[in-house]
Amino acid sequence: MNSFQIIELIGSGSYGKVYKAIHNLSKCTVALKIISVMNIENGLPVEVKYLMKLRDCKNIVHLIEYFYSNDDKLVMVFEYLEYDLWKFISPKNKYMTLSCTKFFIHQLLEGLDELHSQKIMHLDIKPSNLLINPRFDLKIADFGFTTYIGNPHLAHQVISLFYRPPELLMGSRNYGPEVDIWSVGCIIVEMLTGFYMFAGSNDSLQLELIFKTFGTPTEKNWPGISKLSGYSPYLGSKSKKYPSKSLKDISKFKSFSNSTLDIILRMLTLCPKNRISTKEALNHPWFFEDPIASPPLDDIINCLVSRPVKISKQHQKTNNCNNNNGSYDIIPPNSILVPKRSSSQQAALQTQQVVDVDLQYLILKAEQQQIQYQKLVLQTSVPNHIYKEVYEVNQLLKQYILRLKQQKVNLNNNNLNNNNNNLYGNNNHNNNNNNNNNNNNNNNNNNYNNNNNNHNNNYNHDNNNNNNYNNNNYKNNNNSNNNFSFNNSNNNNNNNNNNNRNNRNNNNNNNNNNNNNNYNNNSNNNSYNNNFNNGFNNNDNINDDNNNNNSYNNVNNNNINNNNNNNNGFNGFNNYGNNFNNSNNNGNQFGANNNSFNNTDFSNDSNYGSYCNGLMDLINNNSMYNGGNYYMNNASFHQRIQEHIQKIQQQQLQQMEDQQQEKLNFRDYHPLSIPSQHHNTSSSDTHNNNNNNYNNNNNNNNNINNNNINSIHNQSSDHNHFIPNNGFTNENNNNHCINNMNNSNNNNNNNIGNIGSNGGSINEMGNNNNNNNNNNNNNNNNNNNNNNINANHNRNNNNGSNDFSDFNGNQMVINSYNNNSNNNGNINGNNNNGNGNINGIIGNNNNNNSNNNNNTSFNGNRTTTTTTTSSNFNNINNNNNNSNNNNKNNNNKNNNNNNNNNNNNNNNNNNNNNNNNSNNNSINNNTNNNNNNNNNNNGNGLTSSYANHFQYNHPPFNISNAPHPIPFLNNQSIPNSNYQFLNRFSFSNYSNNNSNGLANNYQNPFGHGATNSNNNNSGNNDHVFGHNTFNFNQNNNNNNNNNNNNNNNNNNNNNNNSNNNSNNNNYNSNNNDNSNSNSNNNNNNNNNNNNSLFNNFNTHNNSINRGNNSFDSFNNGFNHLKNNNNNINNNNNDINNNNNNNNNNNNNNGITKNNTQFGPNILSSTQTSHNSPVSLTPISVSSSSFSNYSPTSFSSSSMESLSSSSEFLSSESLSFTNSNQFSPLLNSASQDINNNSRSSRHRSKLNIDTKGNNNNNNNNKNNNNNNNNNNNNNNNNNNNNNNSNNINNDNNNNSNNNSNSNNNNSNSNNNNNSNNNNNNSFGLKRYVDDNEEQLLANQKKKKNIKSSPLPSASSSQQSQTQQQHQIQQQSQTQQQSQTQKIENNDGLSVENPIVLD
């Protein structure tokens, strides 16, 4: 008790006493209920027990805490509610209006319904136990008699006498919740008439009054009444009998409507079983007819004025009005306000006096409570519930004051009529609301712009206060054209919002007009973002915070677009300024009020400012004061308010945490970061894409999270640029980026959308492509998510190509992605085909499609750290197979599908891609299950090699001796500080986990190439170093995906090649935007396979066996390995064959991927003791088929023994069901390879080949544009042809180091040979030091000496194997003829590689 200061006694009874008190620490006013005698139930006082159980109910008084005093009295601390229902209806039998009665009774029934649904009876419902706060929330109090339904020990002396039902008066001890309903009926009559329904002095008189009104009950109308203990005394033979009669015959009920009488009679039915329940009462027609339930504005004035109010003499003199009609003093505080209606002027004067008195009282209360709230904010001992209640009271009072002031103005202008509503200006206010709504709808954009500027500036300015060194920049930006651009953007957004609301159904039906408008209008937002980013361009780290503000504001605007159709007024306040003002679309009359409140009351408290604005907007929109349908909303009104408050708090807390985390991440992971000196254009382009994607997604709320994340990562892309020094010096001042995207909890694809955003014209081209893709995506709502995400990747393609444009060996990018893409799968889970496309961008395609496709299952279940360049190999094969099917389908279905394309893509600029894509749509309907899985896997594979492979020329150096620490994801250190790397390397790191979160997602930052681990289950991703040289795969991959986006039927990768063919041939005029991407697609088909083979050779996986996943899904696919050629030749026969081809090709590719797992030893995270440079041991492995294959590292000798067998190609039984079988072999492989005496020479040769391969890739990018059509056609004819092309390209890479023309020739040779060299795609090349004759001799010798322990295949398969072998020999002959010497920068030379079967 020492914690409280008792102010006054406010109630007493047999239960104890209730005091008004102040909590000493928080200065919060509370009610203390002290009970000396208490009923104990299950060890707790009854009242405490049930109040604790019901403390979350909105219509139940809130118990803050309870304790026992020194004298063992129970002290319960309640929220303080000054009023109760009795005070509204008690003064001289003053009755309430019907609408006000409905307003409170509805809340009372809601509270009782909550009690009864939890099997609780209150047993003391009466007006004095129904507390009311200034917001007019009714709360049930006094649970001293409460018990549970079915209690066998019930007492009949419960409930106050005037509200006690007849069964209790007659001594019943077997009753239920019907007794509470009887009390509610009595309260209704009391509220409407101002008199008690039954006011007997004892039980017998009370019963007599009841029977006089409703008649004496009998067994007929009350079965079981004769069994009650009080039946004989009250209803015996000597008792008086009363006839039943209608309430209409009673004078005080004559004015009641039929529905009012009906609900009263159903509540006051004598037989308890016939009484209405709370749920039935809440649905009674009485609540749904005029007058509508509304809060008691007039009655609250009466109640407030009737209380003593201290008014100064000066105020009294001011309010003494002398005029022609006489003088009128102020109404005494204790009198009842019933204005005399002798004249309108008299009524006006009296009402004005009341308003003046009421204003003084309300202002005083508001100021007192505001002081209390300010003190409460600094304390933590009082629950948040009290904070919210106090502040809500303040704001509602202030709103009420504003209304009274308006009424005062109306009174002074004599705008009153004789009726009560006009007396207080309610009707006039209704008209004003309607007019304001109309006017504001017309002028919505202007108000919205002004409000947005204020709120955005205030919000961002608050953030800048935390970063003081950015205040000036921010102010300068606001004073410049930024505001103008932002205003224009808001205008456009508002217009588009209206369009979206009006045409939402049309948008769902492939109407792109509104979406296009959104995109175009949002370009203004982009201009704002551009200026904003430019203003902060030279600041370090702070870009993260300010850009976060921009991204949140942009997304919030779009959130309102999605929510406007349902509940603009309320949801608009979920997210600060922009959303706040978006609500003006519906409730615009409150827009001005919102501004005035924000300028005064809410400036220091955005939580409650937003909340109270939402509350007041709800009041207006629901016509709470204007006779609207508030009773329908009242049931959920307070719940929505509470949810709204929590949502605002959670959003703000989450936003602050995200901002703080981003700053911490940036500082922790980027120790080399310095202020960015470039990338302004890139920043703006990225923001453009974000806004565009989001607005196009207005029809699909699932994309909100994606684009939120995208916006966040745009900031990461903006400011995470650094210029390293010393060992990382960039002599040409090329762009260096560290893209650390740790915020991608929702969408990994959007993160990829920000890779290498380096600015320049290519970025702008990327934006144009994105715009078109976004518009195309709107054609199909089911694919909006996929397309929008892929549109971001389209931007990536161009950014990546820009990154590679200045390829002087000085560019370097570390891409660390700590991505948890669970949300991708969840958001797009219904789009089976689209999932792969979205997640495929970053390798998560495997995860999503692992349940659908064997090949994808293989990749998705990999928990090893194998480099995924082999995945590229497989997926490129899939591309070719699918393209083959699609090209033929295009030829057959071209005319019909062109019509479909026109219907689906009315607003697309990139119709080049869409023509052929749409052609495939009609056929893909039957092949979606197979083709799309293959395609999705294809996206994943390409992305495996998709990284900013920026070459870095530097002498070999030791990481531990680097001039600066290298930032690692999650602060991971290099496994071995003595690792040394090759002279020329490219590195990036992707770790994409779909399920079970992040495992070890921070794979090697410095692999010799891109390491991409795609994990479906949480395996351990070790550091794997793979030597990689495919520099342009990023562009190729993404362009493939980009083309896929334009096709909403998800035959994505199948359409790539067909798109290239048709675009190059038929749409040359439009190929300005897409020609490069199409060429890159072709290069992707060739170069990725080259890289796959090359990386298969150069990648050794020591920790492959870390995964526990088996790959049973490949069992079926191996049976088709030898039948690929036949199936491919039958692609035109029917769609089912196409499906088989796709499946066969996937499995075939999977086998190829298995082969590519065997590569030279590169250090993994398990090797921590090697101090020597990386040694690379060549391995030769031919094509094979594995079932239940778990990738394992092999020694070179073991692999040579396997490859020497002539039956190795046809074997189908090489099965490793348990990865642990090869753990000894794994160790031996590590030892054999690391101890190889020729490591240095191989390293040098590999360096040379790496450069040659890189140069050839550059050449391919430029030169293959001329050969795209031919290459695609050849690739489409045979899946394996493309792989053979890749091998041939590898053979010619070294020769192309000096001559680019040879590259073109090799491409043409590849095209000629692609139809024949089907098996070459499954062969792996090997670098050797011996001459060619010795190699061939050794090969034949090994075939004669060594034999495989594996069982042979069938005769048909052997024949196919022989044919393939012959074709491979022909290919070798051509390739060997092109062998030549190439010298690298170090003067070393090596023979051109040959391919061994």
Swiss-Prot record:
Family per similarity comment: Belongs to the protein kinase superfamily. CMGC Ser/Thr protein kinase family. CDC2/CDKX subfamily.
PROSITE patterns in the record: PROTEIN_KINASE_ATP (PS00107), PROTEIN_KINASE_DOM (PS50011), PROTEIN_KINASE_ST (PS00108)
Name of the protein: Probable cyclin-dependent serine/threonine-protein kinase DDB_G0292550
InterPro entries according to UniProt: CDK, Kinase-like_dom_sf, Prot_kinase_dom, Protein_kinase_ATP_BS, Ser/Thr_kinase_AS
Domain Protein kinase: 4-287
Pfam families hit by this protein: Pkinase (PF00069)
GO biological process, alphabetically ordered: regulation of cell cycle phase transition
Domain of life: Eukaryota
Low complexity bias (residue ranges): 676-715, 845-941, 1012-1021, 1028-1101, 1115-1155, 1253-1321, 1354-1380
Biased segments, Polar residues type: 1156-1171
Gene Ontology molecular function: any one: protein serine kinase activity
Sorted UniProt keywords: ATP-binding, Kinase, Nucleotide-binding, Serine/threonine-protein kinase, Transferase
EC number: 2.7.11.22
Enzyme class: transferase
